[in-house]
């Protein structure tokens, strides 16, 4: 499961006599699982001409009833306005969304899913959620709860986790 770079780092840490080899291995296992999920996700979305970012934009638009202003899409996706602009350009070229003037304020834009974009969002969201659910088929309910708790505990010791605590 470990990638070659992680094995090399563990071997070097062991050679240098570091005592936290087990923790390094756990971290690298977590990183390897995450990387595998990212690769699998990219492989599943690529035939549709989608990156994860584009998929998230489709999903957010679909969940909002098919229409949102670009700044709100950027905020919900957690990306900059420049990034959302690039994602929207690509999705528009593919015919999955359109930019339209706001009916109440013609200076503002609304991003609107096309019928093709809505169909793709419907299909992919169902496929994607089933695939993600299948990743945890080997864990019973109690194990899933335990894993969630353990991951939350690890997250609390990351810089992001510490900075989000009151």
Tell where the protein language model's regions lie, with residue ranges.
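Short capping segments at the starts of secondary-structure elements
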Residues: 64-69
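Key DNA-contact positions within bacterial/archaeal DNA-binding proteins
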Residues: 82
């Amino acid at each position: 499961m470990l990638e070659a770079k992680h094995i090399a780092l563990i071997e070097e840490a062991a050679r240098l006599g570091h005592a936290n080899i087990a923790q390094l291995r756990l971290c690298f296992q977590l990183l390897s699982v995450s990387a595998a999920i990212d690769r699998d996700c990219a492989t599943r979305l690529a035939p549709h001409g989608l990156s994860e970012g584009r998929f998230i934009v489709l999903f957010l638009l679909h969940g909002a009833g098919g229409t949102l202003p670009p700044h709100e899409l950027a905020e919900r996706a957690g990306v900059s306005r420049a990034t959302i602009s690039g994602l929207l350009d690509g999705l528009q070229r593919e015919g999955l969304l359109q930019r339209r003037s706001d009916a109440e304020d013609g200076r503002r834009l609304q991003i609107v899913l096309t019928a093709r974009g809505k169909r793709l969002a419907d299909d992919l969201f169902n496929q994607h959620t089933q695939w993600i659910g299948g990743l945890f088929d080997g864990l019973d309910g109690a194990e899933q709860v335990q894993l969630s708790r353990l991951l939350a505990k690890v997250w609390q010791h990351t810089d992001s986790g510490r900075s989000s605590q009151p």
